[in-house]
């Protein structure tokens, strides 16, 4: 399936979906995403990238598995702090693959590249709405996002 297979699922589903890795990804569980409201932002990195060109790079699958297990637990518990730690583990795996460091943000509990990484967008998770909103106001390339979308 390559990288980024989950992106269409995000558009079709509302809430937070936790996937199990296998031959074909399987939905483990889905829950509403209310606990994420006011905590997330995107940063546009303006870094050109070729995601398919990086699909066969070496990866630390043990670290990726630990990040996934930590994220699953965090979503199950609705824990922003645990989810931030899981996102930070995923980012550590991205750095080991050679991705560029992302800028720090005050009040951010975790950040990482979205999708297959290497550029494009990065997700920033904040402990409080005020910190998220300050981050969004700090640059034109930052946008607040919420766990639900409206398709018109």
Feature map (PLM): residue ranges:
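C-terminal nucleotide
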Residues: 2, 6-116, 123-152
């Amino acid at each position: 399936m390559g990288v980024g297979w989950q992106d269409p699922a995000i558009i079709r589903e509302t809430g937070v979906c936790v996937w199990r890795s296998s031959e074909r990804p399987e939905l483990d569980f889905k829950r509403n995403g209310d606990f994420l409201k006011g905590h997330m932002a995107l940063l546009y990195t303006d870094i050109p990238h070729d995601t398919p060109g990086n699909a066969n790079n070496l990866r630390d699958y043990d670290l990726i598995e630990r990040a996934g297990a930590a994220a699953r637990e965090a979503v199950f518990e609705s824990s922003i702090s645990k989810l931030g730690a899981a996102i930070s583990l995923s980012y550590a795996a991205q750095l080991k693959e050679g991705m560029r460091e992302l800028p720090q943000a005050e009040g951010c509990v975790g950040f990482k590249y979205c999708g297959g990484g290497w550029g494009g967008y990065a997700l920033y998770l904040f402990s409080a709405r005020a910190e998220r909103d300050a981050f969004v106001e700090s640059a034109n390339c930052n946008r607040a996002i919420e766990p639900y979308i409206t398709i018109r």
